[in-house]
Design a protein with these regions (language model features):
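Short, well-structured N-terminal submotif of metal-dependent ribonuclease cores
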Residues: 1-40, 46-61, 67, 85-91, ...
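Acidic, PIN/NYN-like endoribonuclease modules and their adjacent C-terminal/linker elements
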Residues: 2, 21, 45-46, 106-155
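A generic structural signal for well-ordered alpha-helical segments
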Residues: 31, 62-63, 103, 135
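Short, charged/polar low-complexity linear motifs in solvent-exposed/disordered segments
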Residues: 31-32, 74-75, 96-97, 130, ...
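General small-molecule cofactor/ligand-binding pocket signal
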Residues: 39, 70, 141-143
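Residues at the C-termini of beta-strands that transition into short coil/loop
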Residues: 42, 73, 146
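Active-site neighborhoods of divalent-metal-dependent phosphate/nucleic-acid chemistry enzymes
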Residues: 69-127, 149
């Protein structure tokens, strides 16, 4: 069974960013090769609607058969609101909380992001997962694309 990856908006932008491309492009190659199942949410779609054309083309280049589209629902909104109510992050980070809630509810194996301030942050991850467990969900692994690099065994 393929691992289920929820990729937030920052990773799509990172593909074209000099600072992040080195680690983002190999992840997309692995996605295109069908190594993972991509979880793509309505939140990500909405955020990318204003992105440059090359970013939107990157989205459409991914294979539909390896992608699950996930709508935002009341359960996700409630969980995201809970993260804020419990002060894991502030009110201005609601969209980030929605990404985490959707990934959690959709049983993603990993949420992948380049957002180190609000998402890929040890203290924040602890907070999100404490609330997930308190609400009957499993913990969510939150990583950056760098954690998905493959290395030659001869190195």
């Amino acid at each position: 069974m393929k691992q289920r990856l929820y990729i937030d908006t920052s990773v799509f932008g990172g593909f074209f960013d000099e600072e992040f491309a080195e680690f983002t492009k190999p992840l997309f190659e692995r996605l295109k090769n069908g190594e993972f199942e991509l979880l793509f949410s309505a939140v990500t779609q909405d955020e990318l609607s204003a992105a440059p054309e090359r970013v939107r083309k990157l989205v459409t280049s991914l294979k539909a058969e390896n992608t699950e589209f996930i709508e935002t629902n009341n359960e996700a909104v409630e969980l995201a609101t809970n993260y804020i109510a419990e002060k894991v992050v502030g009110q201005t980070s609601f969209a980030d909380c929605l990404h985490i809630a959707i990934a959690t509810i959709s049983r993603a194996d990993y949420l992948i992001s380049w957002n180190f301030k609000h998402i890929v942050n040890v203290q924040k991850i602890r907070g999100y997962n404490a609330i997930n467990i308190k609400n009957g969900y499993r913990e969510l692994e939150i990583r950056s694309p760098r954690d998905f690099m493959t290395y030659d065994d001869n190195d």
